[in-house]
Each structure stands twice: as C-alpha cells, then as structure tokens.
A protein has these predicted regions:
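Conserved short histidine dyad/triad with adjacent acidic residue
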Residues: 2-4, 17-38
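Short, conserved beta-strand element in jelly-roll/cupin
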Residues: 38-53, 96
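Short acidic-glycine-tyrosine-enriched beta hairpin
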Residues: 56-77
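Acidic/histidine-enriched, beta-strand-rich ligand/metal-binding domains
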Residues: 79, 83-87, 92, 97-107, ...
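Double-stranded beta-helix
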Residues: 86-163
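Extended alpha-helical scaffolds
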Residues: 131-202
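Phosphorylation-prone, low-complexity intrinsically disordered regions
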Residues: 187-225
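Charge-dense, extended regions
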Residues: 216-253
C-alpha cells in the first residue's frame, strides 16, 4: 500500500476564528489594535455581527463596512483596525504565508518613540511569546490596543494633511524591528507556502505525463477548535488558532 503524503493546507494559508474585541477606545469605537503586516495579505470572512475595517494607506484613511457574508482582503502595508459595531462581530481570518504571521510578521502602530526602541516596543506589546504577536493577558491586550490607537491617530492626521512621509517613516521603523527575522521568515516561506505551490507544479507535470502515483498518496487531515481557555489575545480580538503548518516547517527565531 502506498505511503500517504501530508497535504499542505490550501494555498499555504492559515485560518483562525476571531471575536473582535468589544472594548471602547477613547474615540468611542470598539475594536482591536491597529497594525500592519509586512509580508502577508490578510482576508476577513465575516460570519456574524457587523462593524467596519478601518484602513490606512498612502491613499489615506478609509472604512470598509463589514456584515455577515462580507469578504474583504488587504495586502502587506495596509494598516488596519477592526471595529466591532454591534458588539458581536465574528470573522474567519485567512492569512497568506502560514507561519510568517505566527513568527511576528505584524507590527503595531505604537507612537514613533516606542517603535524606535526594540525594548520599549517589546514591553508595550506585552507578548505571550517573544517570537509571536499574541498578548500575555486581557489587561495587556487592552493597554497595547490603546497605545496602538494613539499612534494610529497620529499617522492618520499626518497622512490626511498630505504628509505621506509619515507612512514611510512608520514602515522603516517596523522593518527595523523585524530585520533580524527576515532569514527565518524566508526559510518558513520556502519550506511552507512556496513548497506548496511548487508541489502543484509537480502534480501538473505528473498528470501531463499520465502519472497518477501522487493521487494514490492522498490523505485527509483535520484540526478541531481549541478549548475556550486556550483562546489567544490577538491584535484584533480573541482568537481560536489552528496548527496547520507541517511539523517540518516551524519558526526558529
């Protein structure tokens, strides 16, 4: 009998279930911490409730309405903030490049002086895991959310006044915080998402040659939702995360 072959999760992506925070900020809006991904596209599939996604790019501040059934996605460099409009916003998050977000691909929009100091950033981020992005507890998640919103508003004001250099400065500070991880990120991408794409090329070549051996190695995999006590304090809200990365593709930061 042929040995089975572990299947990559579709597209080398990762999924999680998100309950957006319902804590009110100083501006009266409830929701999560504004942040940016440096290398990954993110998608929201709204499965309950309603709200909005605020985005900040070189084009300025924008707001995307979210309601059940909405699918929204945004590329690297899009600063984003999830707003819980009715207190019940729930989303399935699809992340490009499984492994990279878990390895710290996201950077919060803290004020510039905090971003300029790696130690200050790490302390303000209150990380559960130094290599990741989840907060250590609810109070820490609340504090860092408020600090990130203060930096977000400053960026939005400058960009709204036509000073796009504010965005460049933020990106450069974010890159400086993560520059020492780039080699590890590239390994994760090469061994995971890139390998998943390459495997499709191998399968197409086999089919073109009339070979079906790879189909005989097919297997199914499943992951179940974590226990409620194991839900993470993410940047946007409480997260149910799933370990979808093959064992051979793990961050070594």
């Amino acid at each position: 009998m042929p040995e089975t072959e572990s299947a990559f999760f579709p597209g080398g992506t990762a999924v999680s279930r998100l309950q957006v925070y319902d804590w009110a900020a100083d501006d009266g809006l409830c929701g999560g911490s504004p942040h940016v991904h440096l290398a990954c596209t993110e998608a929201y599939v709204v499965v309950g409730g309603s709200g909005a996604l605020q985005t900040l790019t070189a084009q300025g501040l924008a707001e995307i309405p979210l309601r059940t059934g909405t699918v929204a996605w945004f590329g690297p460099g899009t600063i984003h903030r999830a707003i819980n409009g009715d207190g019940a916003l729930r989303v399935v998050v699809v992340m490009q490049n499984a492994g990279l977000p878990e390895a710290g691909d996201a950077v919060l929009t803290f004020p510039s002086d905090v971003l300029a100091d790696p130690g200050a950033y790490a302390a303000a981020a209150s990380l559960l895991d130094p290599g990741g992005s989840h907060a250590s507890d609810e109070n820490a998640a609340h504090r860092r959310r408020d600090l990130a919103i203060s930096g977000f508003h400053r960026l939005a004001e400058r960009i709204g006044a036509g000073d796009v250099s504010a965005l460049t400065e933020f990106y450069r500070q974010a890159l400086a915080l993560r520059a020492d991880r780039l080699d590890a990120w590239e390994r994760l991408w090469r061994d995971g998402p890139s390998a998943a794409v390459a495997r499709t090329g191998d399968h197409l070549a086999a089919l073109r040659d009339g070979r079906v051996d790879h189909l005989l190695r097919a297997a199914a995999e499943v992951r179940h939702a974590p226990e409620p006590a194991d839900r993470k304090f993410g940047m946007c809200g409480r997260l149910d995360t799933y370990e979808l990365t093959p064992p051979s593709v793990k961050p070594a930061l």
